[in-house]
Curated annotation (Swiss-Prot):
Subcellular location: Cytoplasm
Cellular component GO terms, alphabetical: cytoplasm
Protein name, entry field: N-acylneuraminate cytidylyltransferase
UniProt entry keywords in alphabetical sequence: Cytoplasm, Nucleotidyltransferase, Transferase
Origin species: Neisseria meningitidis
Family: Belongs to the CMP-NeuNAc synthase family.
Pfam families reported for this sequence: CTP_transf_3 (PF02348)
Transmembrane regions listed in the UniProt entry: none
Keyword Nucleotidyltransferase annotated: yes
One Gene Ontology term of the molecular function aspect: N-acylneuraminate cytidylyltransferase activity
Amino acid sequence: MEKQNIAVILARQNSKGLPLKNLRKMNGISLLGHTINAAISSKCFDRIIVSTDGGLIAEEAKNFGVEVVLRPAELASDTASSISGVIHALETIGSNSGTVTLLQPTSPLRTGAHIREAFSLFDEKIKGSVVSACPMEHHPLKTLLQINNGEYAPMRHLSDLEQPRQQLPQAFRPNGAIYINDTASLIANNCFFIAPTKLYIMSHQDSIDIDTELDLQQAENILNHKES
């Protein structure tokens, strides 16, 4: 098969925290719809695939004019990994070369412009990963890990706990919005983080991840403010 740039959107129908989360609407458009629109407007992809286990999600995806792959129940459970869902989608459509980008519907403030900018960091020759991230709200070196029997140890040095944050190295966390990989490398390594990994930095606001009703309200408020 010729090289293609594939977007895969994993959208389970059932969600324990927020029922039918991926179909919940924000300014009249479902979370799934916001992500599909971002993928389309980015103009980065030859094909956009929604992988789901539910008919309602499949119908919504088709309303936006994208392809649907039905995922078996064992790949759509609470414990199933995202990588297994992406590889299943690639195998189903017969894609094994080019690029694959995971876009999650729970990141509705990620735009087409974000995707284009992240794509510009991807190097086809090096074939590492590009992962979206945002600055850490709390620095990881200022934390303690429980090791055993109520004992705790610092992430690195006890002295880090008393250092001004500005004197510590910058820290970022993946925000779940964008994962870009060479398709063959992702299949071979069975993971999203492949060295060398480049980070595409997004703001805290644009990095909001929808897990609760409050998250949804906050995201809608941010979107309304952007559009006002």
